[in-house]
């Protein structure tokens, strides 16, 4: 279940970020702060962004920042940085205000997390609710399926 991947403090609302790369770094840093990954994982995700471009921007307003399963990851984890002022990633899905980050130590966890995330985010109601949410508690309720 998706909720088991989020640690306390891994959902943050923020007004602005100077760039998409900075927002990605901040979102992934939430995984480091929660003990799910080492600081090296931030570098791995940013390198993925530099090499592959803004493929993290997977839907209008939504990005899922991640790297391949890594030794820099201690346990599966997810985090979310929601920006009040969206940033441009350089993709057709701009502007981006929801920057999820994901980490996994192995392929099976990685695929399971992607499936859980895709299942939740596949409904327009969830997407719109997250995009319009203005409080951390509301976002938590949406993600953990209490408000839907």
Predicted regions located by residue number:
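Cytosolic covalent-transfer regions centered on His/Cys nucleophiles
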Residues: 1-148
